[in-house]
Amino acid sequence: MKNFFSMHAILLACSAGAGLAAITQGISEGTYSRIVEMATISQAAYANLCNIPPAITSAGKIYNAETDINGWVLRDDSRQEIITVFRGTGSDTNLQLDTNYTQAPFDTLPQCSGCAVHGGYYVGWVSVKDQVEGLIHQQASQYPDYSLVVTGHSLGASMAAITAAQLSATYNNITVYTFGEPRTGNQAYASYVDETFQATNPDATKFYRVTHTNDGIPNLPPTSQGYVHHGTEYWSVEPHGPQNMYLCLGDEVQCCEAQGGQGVNDAHVTYFGMASGACTW
């Protein structure tokens, strides 16, 4: 299969807006493998963690019946990591959260001055906040040398982003991997994430916002409603591999977002050849 776009076409596509986004082609094998591993866990969350790596065990379930937010706190003793993963949209209740674009003040994180986040996802976060913080505190107390990882796809990606921002007030060893993440907050929130996780510095970042070809969900909610993406975008094109990952840094309209995808499409439900909940990998 040919590459999804030539580099020339990518640069043209990314030149919309005030200026040209900075594009870097290729990432290391190690970073790519790590991203794919987190994508596996995020996609498996749609089917009760089917086919996750055998070294990873569940330390507790996250669930709220009113919002239908689902997730797990996991532990990988081989890597000394405590992993929190959120499932993406899996019900009409979740869809109601998805479409609540009214921004909500990020009141649970007063350190984030002026920050507002997606109203539906904030409702989701508040509904499970105590569970998440309790489970992570339990694991972090028992395994104080372990680092924290937060991940998720789609709705789960925004939940992961909000969770990581919240946890940053307590922990300083957090790495985040999101897949098909919608825009999650306003400029103040995006700036907070960028600063906290060094998200605009590919050499030091602790936040990997991964997109895929023309996935339509990263185009939502629209910027006209005050939403802004945070950090460097890690754009995956096909055929999948470390050399077909592009780091897109700069303008809001960049790589995936510039391809015209709208809403849930094939590129959204499949990342690195793994369909959400299909468990065929």
Swiss-Prot record:
Catalytic-site annotation from UniProt: S154, D215, H268
GO cellular component term, pick one: extracellular region
PROSITE patterns in the cross-refs: LIPASE_SER
Catalysed reaction, written as an equation: feruloyl-polysaccharide + H2O = ferulate + polysaccharide
Primary location: secreted
Cell location: Secreted
Record bears the keyword Cell membrane: no
Similarity comment: family membership: Belongs to the AB hydrolase superfamily. FaeA family.
Protein name: Probable feruloyl esterase A
Gene it is expressed from: faeA
